[in-house]
Amino acid sequence: MAFSVGSVGCLLGPVSRSAGLLGGRWLQGSRAWLGLPDTRRLPVIQQTRGRTRGNEYQPSNIKRKNKHGWIRRLSTPNGVQVILRRMHKGRKSLSH
């Protein structure tokens, strides 16, 4: 099955003529020739995933009482000043 130069030119002849008639659009990779939508014009819907926010504060009653409680306030001189300052200001709640 040896092809001669004339038979190859005959095989490529209609392709080159259709390319000339179509303006070379088949070389641009247009998907319209395959019956598929052109994906370059469709909007890209992409889900953005970042770090979750809003869950930084996880309250602990034990830590709250240890840091700001009555026993802790009275155990240091500065804590006593905090209690006296709040009493002088008229606070109903002096500590946790």
UniProtKB/Swiss-Prot annotation:
Q: Which Pfam families match?
A: Ribosomal_L34
Q: Which GO terms describe its cellular component?
A: mitochondrial inner membrane; mitochondrial large ribosomal subunit
Gene Ontology terms for molecular function: structural constituent of ribosome
Keyword match Ribosomal protein: yes
Please give the superkingdom of this protein's source: Eukaryota
Using the UniProt record, give the first listed, main subcellular location. mitochondrion
Q: Where in the cell is it found?
A: Mitochondrion
| GO biological process, alphabetically ordered | translation
Mark out the transit peptide: 1-50
Database matches in InterPro entries: Ribosomal_bL34 (IPR000271)
Q: Which residues form a coiled coil?
A: none
Annotated keywords: Mitochondrion, Phosphoprotein, Ribonucleoprotein, Ribosomal protein, Transit peptide
What positions are modified (Phosphoserine)? 75
User: Subunit arrangement?
Assistant: Component of the mitochondrial ribosome large subunit (39S) which comprises a 16S rRNA and about 50 distinct proteins.
Question: What family does the entry list?
Answer: Belongs to the bacterial ribosomal protein bL34 family.
State the name under which the record lists this protein. Large ribosomal subunit protein bL34m
Query: Native species of this protein?
Result: Bos taurus
Gene (name only): MRPL34
